[in-house]
Amino acid sequence: MSMNIAIDGPAGAGKSTIAKKLAKELGFIYVDTGAMYRAMAYYVLTNGIASSDEAKIAEACQDVDVTIAYENNEQQVILNGKNINGFIRTEEVGNMASATSVYPVVRTKLVELQRKLAESTDVIMDGRDIGTCVLPNAQVKIYLTAGSKTRAQRRYDELTAKGVSCDFDEIEKDIIDRDYRDMHRETSPLKQAEDAVLVDSSEMDIDEVVEAIRSIYEEKKSC
C-alpha cells in the first residue's frame, strides 16, 4: 500500500519548498498540484480566455492534457506535450490559477490525475485541499501556514533576488485577497482537515519545518 503525505495551506506558506525537500529525504515522489492548476491557468491566459468565462474554460479543459514527468529528479509540468515549467511561476499565472480553480470542471480533471498518482506511489502532495478533498485518506496530513506579512516578505525577497521590481504592500494585499478567495470558494475551500497537524512556519526556517513534519511522519508510520 502506498504512503501519502498531504500538505495544505495558504499561498506563500512554503508548501512547495518544504514538500520537495521532504520528498527527497524520504524517497517519495513530489507532486506539486498547484503547478498543475498553474498549467491550466497558463493555457487560459495564452488563449485569451477571461477568468470569468466559465463556459470557455470548460471547453478548454477538453483540450488540455497536463502531465508530470521527472528529469534529473526534478518535476517537469507538461502541457499538451510542451514543458512549461519556466512559464508558470509568475504572479499573473498564480492569480489566474486561483480564479479558475473555483470551477468544478477544472478541479475534476486535475484531481483525477492526482489520485491516480497517489494510488500506486508514495507521494507528497501540496495544495489547498489535498487532505480534505484530493487525498482524504492520506496517512499524514499537515496544515502549513504563516502570517501574511511573513509570506509577503518571503515572496518579496524571492522576486527581488531575481531582479524583479515589486511592491511589498501590493504583494501582501494579493496574498490576503487570495486567502479570502481560496477560503470562501464554493468548491473545496481552503481549510484545515480535522485530522491535520497545524505547523506555523512564521518563526521557523526550512530545515526546522522539514524536521517537524518528518517527526510527525515517523510517529504516524510507527502507529
Regions found by a protein language model. Name each.
Residues 4:
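Walker A (P-loop) ATP-phosphate-binding motif of ABC ATPase nucleotide-binding domains
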Residues 7:
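Hydrophobic anchor at the beta1->P-loop junction of P-loop NTPases
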Residues 11:
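The conserved Walker
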Residues 15:
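Conserved lysine of the Walker
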Residues 18:
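Hydrophobic positions on the alpha1 helix immediately C-terminal to the Walker A/P-loop
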Residues 25-89:
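N-terminal phosphate/diphosphate-binding loop that engages ATP/GTP or pyrophosphate donors
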Residues 69, 114-120, 128, 132-133, ...:
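Small-molecule kinase domains that catalyze NTP-dependent phosphoryl transfer to phosphate-bearing small molecules
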Residues 85-97, 101-162:
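ATP-dependent NMP and nucleoside kinases share a basic, alpha-helical "lid"
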